[in-house]
Design a protein with these regions (language model features):
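Active-site helix of classical SDR
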Residues: 132, 168
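Residue(s) in the substrate-gating loop at a strand-loop-helix junction
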Residues: 152
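Substrate-binding pocket helix/loop in short-chain dehydrogenase/reductase
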Residues: 108-109, 116-118
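Conserved glycine-rich cofactor-binding loop
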Residues: 31-32
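C-terminal beta-strand-loop-alpha-helix "lid" module of Rossmann-like NAD(P)-dependent dehydrogenases
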Residues: 185-235
Length: 295
């Protein structure tokens, strides 16, 4: 009988060992940056790795390392179900899920079209949640598994003109906390990774989205300041390479008891600490200055 994403195999559960060289991993958003490096890291640890993205042409370079490309659109339920079914049919298991697919769409709350805000939630939140729904029944049956949600320090603090993006990441943090509690009795670890400044395409893509909202906007000066900070090479040269996130994922999947959260990358820990201890208005001033706001 064909195994489906909604129904785990009927075979007797086999516990997953966290020793390197065992298991099957699925990484979304694997065509570049954090996802690509994470797929390579898991492969180096001995996993059978499926790297998923909407466009498989951008995944072909992964095949040289033995990574299996998987066409998957996290906004399309049929696409996700088909991808999960393929993995289960080929391997009979999914031991690690890395929910990495996502993007940042910046702009003033007033300016961003509500359809774009919805799309960002579809990719960053509902896609993550639905893929998790498809895989957790299988992990529960096996009595083990690791779900790693790539969030952001943007799920712990807010930057100018990023309200819609930050709302998606705050949602990921909350969903992850609930999942961790719900899935713990079944032997499934749920871990959040919160990248700080990482040297990927993310900032330039977010700046493109932001600048698209500038024409005729009452927030044009703020848009110019924030987009400039995002594109600044003087900022980017301090950013951490995406390998730091991949190495963190490697630590998580081999740890007997991984931490619930890992803040990693340029300024991740200091900014989260500052948000925790500073009053709201003091933090507003700090983060505004970092983005070059003129008052």
């Amino acid at each position: 009988m064909t195994t489906t994403a909604e129904q785990a195999p009927a075979a007797a559960p086999q516990a997953f060992s966290k020793a390197p060289g065992t298991g099957v991993a699925l990484v979304t958003g694997a065509s570049s940056g954090i996802g690509e490096d994470t797929a390579h890291k898991l492969r180096a640890l001995g996993y059978i790795v499926y790297g998923a993205a909407r466009r498989t042409d951008r995944l072909q370079a992964l095949t040289a390392d033995g990574i299996r490309p998987l066409a998957m659109d996290v906004t399309d339920d049929a696409s996700m179900s088909s991808g999960v079914n393929r993995i289960l049919e080929e391997t009979g298991r999914i031991d690690v899920l890395v929910n990495n697919a996502g993007y940042g769409s910046y702009g003033a709350i007033e300016d961003v079209p509500i359809d774009e805000a919805r799309r960002q939630f579809e990719v960053n939140v509902f896609g993550l949640a639905r893929l998790t729904q498809l895989i957790t029944p299988h992990m529960r049956t096996r009595g083990s598994g690791t779900i790693i949600n790539i969030s952001s320090i943007g799920g712990r603090l807010t930057t100018p003109l990023g309200g819609w993006y930050h709302a998606t990441k705050y949602a990921v943090e909350a969903l992850s906390d609930a999942l961790r509690i719900e899935l713990s009795p079944f032997g499934i670890d749920v871990v959040v990774v919160e990248p700080g400044g990482i040297r990927t395409e993310w900032a330039s893509i977010a700046a493109d989205h932001l600048e698209a909202t500038a024409e005729g906007s009452a927030y044009a000066d703020q848009i110019r300041d924030v987009a400039g900070a995002m594109r600044s090479e003087s900022n980017r040269r301090h950013y951490s390479p995406p390998e730091v996130i991949a190495r963190t994922v490697g630590k998580i999947v081999t740890a007997r008891h991984p931490r619930t959260r890992y803040a990693v990358g340029f300024m991740a820990k200091p900014l989260i600490a500052a948000r925790r201890v500073l009053p709201d208005r003091a933090f507003d001033q700090l983060i505004g200055a970092a983005f070059g706001f003129r008052r």
